[in-house]
């Protein structure tokens, strides 16, 4: 099983071809392709390749499936004995991203199986 660890949105995510992941919002249209170049680690049949901090020439390519918003997070602040109440909500934007392939130096290391 081949996988890669990428950095996107300030977070590190373990990704595999053929699966989708919810990552921080990307400014790409739905059904648009996007390439992530911040690849920290690649594991395949030949072994593990670790970058310092990134692997030169390694990319993860994928397709944007959907642009969504997460569930609402409520923030409630109150001061006792002061009749002060604040109730606010926040919905974070995120992108549902399907991983198509993992490449190193232009060579495909892993790709999703077309069914």
From Swiss-Prot:
Cellular compartments per GO CC: cytoplasm; ribonucleoprotein complex; ribosome
UniProt similarity note: Belongs to the bacterial ribosomal protein bL21 family.
Any GO BP: translation
Disulphide bridges, residue numbers: none
Origin: domain of life: Bacteria
Transferase recorded as keyword: no
Organism listed in the record: Picosynechococcus sp. (strain ATCC 27264 / PCC 7002 / PR-6)
The UniProt record lists the keyword Iron: no
Keywords: Ribonucleoprotein, Ribosomal protein, RNA-binding, rRNA-binding
Cross-referenced SUPFAM superfamilies: L21p-like
The name this protein goes by in its record: Large ribosomal subunit protein bL21
One Gene Ontology MF term: structural constituent of ribosome
Assembly behavior: Part of the 50S ribosomal subunit. Contacts protein L20.
Pfam families named in the record: Ribosomal_L21p
NCBIfam families reported in the protein's UniProt record: L21
Stored InterPro entries: bL21-like, bL21-like_sf, Ribosomal_bL21, Ribosomal_bL21_CS
Annotated function: This protein binds to 23S rRNA in the presence of protein L20.
